[in-house]
């Protein structure tokens, strides 16, 4: 008997059911690699970032995640080179899918009990996705921006439901806008730390810190005449 199609598990109807010591015998997910490409390139090299965002609340199987990753990676390797991008899968298939196997051969009514004891056995895994949650993210150079968007458009056909391709205004995978990143870089306030940067804070006395300069004023020494 084959596996039940993933369309039977598309809707989120029950609570999360992760793998645990009570839920054993779970098959391994099909997707095993979540970062592809030049994943060790510093944050300065890939300023452009684009996301594939889910527009439905649904379950996405591990097979669909692997198919989308392969489709996006194959297109980017062809047009941007294997060192010209960084692809990251942003969701993980932790939810376990169950199936109550039913016999369909002749004489099956004597072997099975219908819906009595219908708690099924694990048959696969999927990711629980919310509306507006990012599925895939690609960072690259600005000259490969069109290729990154086309790669995500091709990967979109591997997923159920509706998705949108959204170009991020931030610098790469960081949380800072391009203007802030370039400004802090000229001021030597931001340092590359792998994929993400490290923002250096102000040090020293409180009066020398820029965020507090507007509130901390130098002390005024009153003369003896005014005190008297």
Curated annotation (Swiss-Prot):
- Extract the Gene3D superfamilies matched here: Ribosomal protein L10e/L16
GO BP annotation list: translation
Q: Which cysteines are joined by disulfide bonds?
A: none
Q: Name one GO cellular component term.
A: ribosome
| PROSITE patterns linked to this entry | RIBOSOMAL_L10E (PS01257)
User: What InterPro entries does this protein's entry cite?
Assistant: Ribosomal_uL16, Ribosomal_uL16_CS_euk_arc, Ribosomal_uL16_dom, Ribosomal_uL16_euk_arch, Ribosomal_uL16_sf
Q: Which residues form a coiled coil?
A: none
Q: Which UniProt keywords apply?
A: Ribonucleoprotein, Ribosomal protein
Single annotated GO MF: structural constituent of ribosome
Pfam families, per the entry: Ribosomal_L16
Which SUPFAM superfamilies does the record match to this protein?
Answer: Ribosomal protein L16p/L10e (SSF54686)
Keyword field contains Heme: no
Q: Which domain of life is it from?
A: Eukaryota
Q: Which family does it belong to?
A: Belongs to the universal ribosomal protein uL16 family.
Q: How does it assemble?
A: Component of the small ribosomal subunit. Mature ribosomes consist of a small (40S) and a large (60S) subunit. The 40S subunit contains about 33 different proteins and 1 molecule of RNA (18S). The 60S subunit contains about 49 different proteins and 3 molecules of RNA (25S, 5.8S and 5S).
Q: What is this protein called?
A: Large ribosomal subunit protein uL16
* The organism of origin for this protein: Pinus taeda
Taxon lineage: Eukaryota, Viridiplantae, Streptophyta, Embryophyta, Tracheophyta
